[in-house]
Amino acid sequence: MRLNFTKLFAGAVALAWTTESMATNAVTAHLSPLSRSLDHIQSDDSTQRRLRTINGADEERFSRMSMAGLRRALELELKEMHLESVATNQLVVRICTILGIEVAKSTPTNLNKLAELIKVEKEAENVAKKVQNPVDQADVILGLLIYPVKQGDVLGNKLLEKWPLLPKKAIINRFHRLKNHEVPKEPQPFAAHVHAPVVVAH
């Protein structure tokens, strides 16, 4: 009798375990598509967030600069610049040197010489190929930003298209470096007896 009771009890336990297991499997089977769907959605969301982050970084890194955007970024600083200062005169000499434009002996005349930059507007591709050093590129753009030369922004935008790897930070840093070297208070152009270096056109 004891043996039969033991077998009966063992059978009941086994049946209960089997029933519970089947019920659990049924619930799991019922929920698993939803669970898989949620996992898939979460995975998709994570992927999208990751892609947005990557794309956002790429967009910021490779966003095309424009002369208008640079002017907005340097609006206050540009207003404080003195076109006749020693520093800006030296910038003109440097830009003319970079582009192979002959520099006059008297520095104030070099301000007029900068207008010759516009002659290369239709040759922006040649200028872009010639000027490969990022520092030189930044200075050319900086010169076009500082001086209100006719069609300067048109030329600048064309050059920026040709120099997609030139970072905005490089231009801004060059600007601040120029500004820090500027003569304080009332900057004056070079005296008549002070001659800028003569640059022979290449």
From Swiss-Prot:
Any one GO CC term of the record: host cell nucleus
Name of the protein: Secreted RxLR effector protein 11
Induction note: Expression is up-regulated at later stages of infection.
Function: Effector that acts as a broad suppressor of cell death to interrupt plant immunity. Inhibits cell death induced by cell death-inducing proteins, including the PAMP elicitor INF1 from P.infestans.
Residues in the signal sequence: 1-23
Keywords from the UniProt entry: Host cytoplasm, Host nucleus, Secreted, Signal, Virulence
Chain ranges for the short sequence motif RxLR-dEER as given in the UniProt record: 49-61
Gene name linked to the record: RxLR11
Family as reported in the entry's similarity comment: Belongs to the RxLR effector family.
Free-text note regarding domains: The RxLR-dEER motif acts to carry the protein into the host cell cytoplasm through binding to cell surface phosphatidylinositol-3-phosphate.
Compartments reported by the entry: Secreted; Host cytoplasm; Host nucleus
